[in-house]
């Protein structure tokens, strides 16, 4: 299994399985001198950890991070940063009934066909449990970007199943377990999830992420375009089936006179491009939307096959998120942060001394 590393200069390699003794990551390429401690990382992990409400998996993991290397006297040294998170609440017996069968919609079948061996306990390496190290690494990236450029990366749930969530205020996002920017809709979402759980089914979600204060010039055309790497990273999140940058698929119905964001001396007029033109950041907000499929581990009986290719009926009885999208907001934020820090370092390496006479215009015209 060779696809475990993200990035070019700022790289993150994750390791571990859902029911193994621990999970974690190694960050290489982090600039030295960044003030960093475990509390900085724990703040982000606590936003993602399981068992925080009745609407997510009831697996009780504290997700306490340990910094094993790369930090001395409270500062990064430039050496690899190893982060460890111990698993403490595995319940592998719940998965005995799927040891020889494949859950519809899950990676069980493809992992078995590719590797000829499969850790069926909690999904093994394919589990969303492995997003915790990504969030830990993202916390480091967020801190560096904030201190270097003033970049802020924020996300929210924009839709739960067929329920669209009107945006009201960023302040609401941290006040509810759904990460929605609209407190008034929370009771409706809770009732929806309660009914879904009783039915033994699951549902998908849409998450929006916005990065503000991103400097102009990040991105490496042609094949390492900023938006291409963002899409690549977002598709690396478990259960993500679609990514939009800016207007995304709505661009199909827009005319060029509408979609093209006009430039004035006072700033850009509109941001249909989502902060990226020609694969390079414009200095505007980078806007990303991801679609997350319904969780495949459900109590509803489903048709499948066993390892011998014989018909089987699969029911899953473990502790699972009925909507993995509920905890996906900090994960998507972290992925965006990891791409941005990597491209910031790449830009500095090649184009740090480039200057032009044209002034940088504002992200939006007044």
UniProtKB/Swiss-Prot annotation:
Signal peptide: none annotated. Reduced FMN (FMNH(2)). GO terms for cellular component: cytosol. It comes from the Bacteria. GO terms for biological process: amino acid biosynthetic process; aromatic amino acid family biosynthetic process; chorismate biosynthetic process. Its cofactor is FMNH2. Transmembrane segments: none annotated. FMN binds at residues 125-127, 238-239, 278, 293-297, 319. The keyword Amino-acid biosynthesis applies. Its EC number is 4.2.3.5. Keywords: Amino-acid biosynthesis, Aromatic amino acid biosynthesis, FAD, Flavoprotein, FMN, Lyase, NADP. Pathway: Metabolic intermediate biosynthesis; chorismate biosynthesis; chorismate from D-erythrose 4-phosphate and phosphoenolpyruvate: step 7/7. Pfam families: Chorismate_synt. The keyword Transport does not apply. InterPro entries: Chorismate_synth, Chorismate_synth_AroC_sf, Chorismate_synthase_CS. One of its GO terms (molecular function) is FMN binding. NADP(+) binds at residues 48, 54. This reaction introduces a second double bond into the aromatic ring system. HAMAP family: Chorismate_synth. Homotetramer. This is Chorismate synthase. The gene is aroC.
